[in-house]
Structure formats: C-alpha cells, structure tokens
A protein has these predicted regions:
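Short glycine-enriched, charge-decorated loop/helix-capping segments at active-site entrances
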Residues: 117, 156-161
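Proteins enriched for Cys/Gly/acidic motifs involved in redox and nucleic-acid/cofactor modification
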Residues: 1-153, 174
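Alpha-helix-loop-beta-strand connector modules within alpha/beta enzyme cores
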Residues: 161-181
C-alpha cells in the first residue's frame, strides 16, 4: 500500500521510517498483520503502549542491521501500564483521567475482554494524586475514562477501612479536591 511505498522512497533517500500498528484490532490480529504486511515494523496492543519508545529504538537498530522481521508485542504484561505512562498536565478547564481498563462481562458482541483483558482499576491514591495534578494545572472538570468505569474497584487509600473502593467512593474522594467542580 501507500505506507510501504512511502517507506521504500524514504529508505532510498537514506531516511529511516518505522511503521507501527497499534490498538485492540492490532492486538487481536497481530501475527496476521506481520505476515500480510512485512513492511510493518511494530504491532502492539493497548496494554503495551508504554513500551513503544523502546520498540521504536529496537526497530531502528534492526533497520541498520538489515535483519528485521517485525516486533510483535501483544501480550498482557505483568506490570500495569499506568505506572509507566508520562504524567499529564492539564491545559484547560477540562481533563481526562484513566481509572480503569478491561472488562469481565464477555458480552457476545464485544471484543474488549479479549483485547483489553480483565478489569483492572488503578488505586484510589494514584487516581487522586493525578487528579490533584490536573486540578493544579487548571482543570475544573475531570472525565473518568475506562472501558467499564462503573465497574471501578480500586484499592483504598492506606489506613482506611476495607480494601477495595467502588466508583462512588472514588467520586467522593475526587470531589474533595480543591478546584474540581
């Protein structure tokens, strides 16, 4: 296709080009993508976005050596990706905050459990800390993100009774943050 042609033209000029395919569908069809489109350098799923910089570096090194077969990273890593993502600073009155990923419902029409994995919720303490950062940057309205946010069940703040918190608990904690409306 067009990307292959662009890559070949750039390589003819001595310019490196790395093509990555990412997302849920890429995760589900990763091996097939590499097989059908050998010019694709990287295929990764949503759970491994945080590894993209090292995959690009690896693909770039492989291009120089000439024996590159494509990097396929579609597994569910042991470590949560939220620990590896850069901290976001709000640049306006509203901001988005990921609190949950995945789904355990397995509805017949949905691929989320297969491509995003089991439900995983961030700890309340981590969500509140990020929300405070967003509020200090000017965010007054914070939209909580996830595939199934109403199933949120994060670890409570240390020292509080009980071990897990539902969405209502999280919202009450976020409402206590100065500046958040």
């Amino acid at each position: 296709g067009r990307l292959r042609n662009m890559k070949v033209k750039r390589e003819d000029k001595g310019q490196s080009t790395v093509i990555a395919v990412a997302g849920c569908v890429a995760q589900a069809a990763g091996a097939e993508i590499i097989k059908r489109a050998p010019y694709v350098d990287i295929v990764l799923g949503p759970q491994t976005y945080h590894r993209l910089p090292e995959m690009v570096a690896k693909a770039t090194r492989a291009e120089g050596g000439g024996t590159h077969k494509g990097i396929l990273d579609i597994e569910f890593p042991e470590e949560p990706k939220f620990d590896h993502l850069p901290k976001v600073v709000a640049k306006g009155a509203s901001a988005f905050l990921s609190v949950q990923e995945g789904c355990d419902k397995f509805c017949t029409f949905c691929v989320v459990p297969y491509t995003r994995g089991a439900e995983y919720s961030r700890a309340v303490e981590d969500v509140v800390a990020e929300a405070k950062t967003l509020a200090s940057g000017g965010a007054k309205e914070i939209t909580l993100l996830g595939q199934n946010v109403n199933a949120y069940h994060g670890e409570k703040i240390k020292g509080e009774t009980g071990s897990e918190a539902g969405l209502g608990y999280l919202i009450r904690r976020l409402a206590e943050i100065d500046g958040v409306e």
